[in-house]
Regions:
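Flexible loop residues that form catalytic
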Residues: 57, 172-173
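Accessory terminal helices/loops
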Residues: 153-166, 173-235
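Residue-level signal for the nucleotide or nucleotide-sugar donor/cofactor binding architecture
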Residues: 63, 145-146, 194
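Active-site metal-binding motif and surrounding structural segment of the metallo-beta-lactamase
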Residues: 34-77
Length: 235
């Protein structure tokens, strides 16, 4: 299995998974801004894209999943009750799909959004905004369909994973090293909190510090309706 993070030098992470026996590939959380880069990489490496997977409906960027489905004929995979249109492969909690001989398993982890999932392959867990590495904590819960108490309660899903599993989150500062779940259990402040009240205080303070999401008014409608707007301010 080849596993690689593709978006160098930016905060939004995209992960490439390849079964080297069949040359089948999956992209997890591809970003529309880099669509051409993904296609170039797939073509230059002789890979067939089987799955474009979104860990949740994003508010900070436009997903490339529906364009990859349109252009390459792959499946667009999300949680079964997502409000995102364009999805043609819906998954349930603990469901597995196969990429060649590689099992890709989905673990429902709502809170940041109501459709959040952890995507697991052997050795790696792609957590979206459900869990970040170290002091970054977790994603904010004050965006559409986010719920603090639900997120807090969903942290119990982490008990399903081996401590040596590498946490590959949806956002990290460029150059951040992806660490193991066991390391995060000791060094991520959310995972050492004693109670929900502590978590609630952290979320409120984090939201105040972060402020608004500049791309939300463009990204959310695009991701719901699977349509690229005529004008994208940041492109």
């Amino acid at each position: 299995m080849l596993f690689e993070q593709l978006n160098d030098g930016v905060w939004a992470m995209t992960y490439l998974i390849v079964d080297e026996e069949t040359s089948e590939a999956a992209l997890v959380d591809p970003v529309y801004d880099y669509l051409d880069n993904y296609i170039d990489r797939l073509e230059s490496s002789g890979l067939t894209l089987k799955y474009a997977i979104a860990t949740h409906m994003h508010a900070d960027h436009i997903t490339a999943c529906f364009k990859l489905r349109e252009q390459l004929g792959c499946d667009y995979v999300m949680w079964k009750s997502t409000s995102s249109l364009g999805v043609n492969r819906y998954v349930e909690d603990e469901e597995k799909i196969m990429l060649g001989s590689i099992p890709i398993q989905f673990h429902y982890s709502p809170g940041h959004t109501s459709d959040s999932v952890i995507v697991h392959v052997p050795g790696y867990m792609m957590t979206g905004d459900f869990l970040f590495n170290g002091m970054a904590g977790v994603g904010r819960d004050d965006l559409p369909s986010g719920r603090m108490k639900v997120h807090w309660d969903s942290l119990s899903v982490l008990d399903r994973f081996l401590e040596e599993t590498i946490v590959c989150s949806g956002h990290e500062a460029p150059g951040t090293e992806m660490m193991s779940l066991g390391w995060n259990m000791k060094n991520n402040p959310i995972l050492t909190m004693p109670d929900f009240e502590s978590y609630e205080s952290w979320q409120i303070a984090s939201a105040e510090q972060l402020g608004g999401v500049s791309k939300i008014k463009v990204a959310v409608p695009a991701n719901i309706f699977a349509e690229i707007p005529e004008h994208i301010p940041w492109m």
